[in-house]
Amino acid sequence: MTALITQEIGSFRKPDYLAKEFHKIERTPKFTELAERATRETLEVFERSGLDNIGIGGEMFRWEMYEHPAERIKGIIFYGMVRSFDNRYYRKGSAIDRLERREPFHVDEVKFVAGTTKKPLKVPITGPYTMMEWSFNDYYDSREDLAMEFARIINEELKDIASVWKQVSGGRRLEIQIDEPATTTHPDEMDIVVDSINRSVQGVDGEISMHVCYSSDYRLLYDRIPDLKIDGYNLEYSNRDTLERGLTDDKRVGFQDLKYFAQINESLQRKKFIGIGVTDVHIDYVEPVELIEDRINYALKIIGDPDLVRINPDCGLRTRSREIGEQKLRNMVMARNNILKQL
């Protein structure tokens, strides 16, 4: 099936037994044991929910999307904690020397998850522009230079993942998701965004998508779709939408940008898919199946081809309880299933 594939974006709330001990036991056999246990339990949640693509099992091996790779890069030191956009905190690093990988970021995680489930997977990895934007630069001549260095390192990581994937995939296609929440932070740096992402995925054989959330203007990204060497986009829309039912523009205000995406996509010889965020990860309110159906149907009215539309939460569900997260995913899949019956 390729129509309206349901997918998870990345993170999911860690069980308390892992979250409370994470930093105390990281990089020990005990950590591996608990992270593997949490991954198996989260995969069960995703499979109970009916997801087609179960990501990487909720990122149980990762504490935070910036800190995890930054800790594994030589040339970065950490100065302290800063607040992120979702009112959580991360350790912000600074590039003080030439960047080199100390060790792989996600290879062991990919091996474990691929060997634990036969479902399709998607490996999220923090993109070069966001790594640059969220770092201090005390070494390189320019922001562009730093972004391209992160791109070089990410390309090494992706090639290692691709190599391992051949051994553990069981015939499944490699799917990579470049996470770039900082994409449109500086409109005058979109050339850096494009060049660094293209460098990151150079020579990597597989399906490449890009995840962006909470952008003030997706049109900055859409304008560069012809230049980006990726296959699709998984984006946030529900956080900016209403909670009212309906298929009119005033009810589906959060999805208006899709019209511009469709216009750009129509001009391409090789069309890109769009993963639409149909449930808000920043509220505990569990959107009713009927509301999610309206959001999907509205998107289909704009995009047309259901093979070009995928269904996902706005972002990772780590900010919600595991129970709320599962309910949101379950309703999302139910809404998709209802629509498939009508197609």
Curated annotation (Swiss-Prot):
Cofactor requirements of the protein: Zn(2+)
GO BP annotations listed: methionine biosynthetic process; methylation
CDD domains given in the database record: CIMS_C_terminal_like (cd03311)
Pfam families according to UniProt: Meth_synt_2 (PF01717)
Alphabetized InterPro entries for the sequence: Met_Synth_C/arc, MetE_arc, UROD/MetE-like_sf
Residues given in the record as Zn(2+) binding sites: H211, C213, E236, C315
Keywords from the named record: Amino-acid biosynthesis, Metal-binding, Methionine biosynthesis, Methyltransferase, Transferase, Zinc
Function: Catalyzes the transfer of a methyl group to L-homocysteine resulting in methionine formation. The physiological methyl donor is unknown.
Protein name: Methionine synthase
Annotated organism of origin: Thermoplasma acidophilum (strain ATCC 25905 / DSM 1728 / JCM 9062 / NBRC 15155 / AMRC-C165)
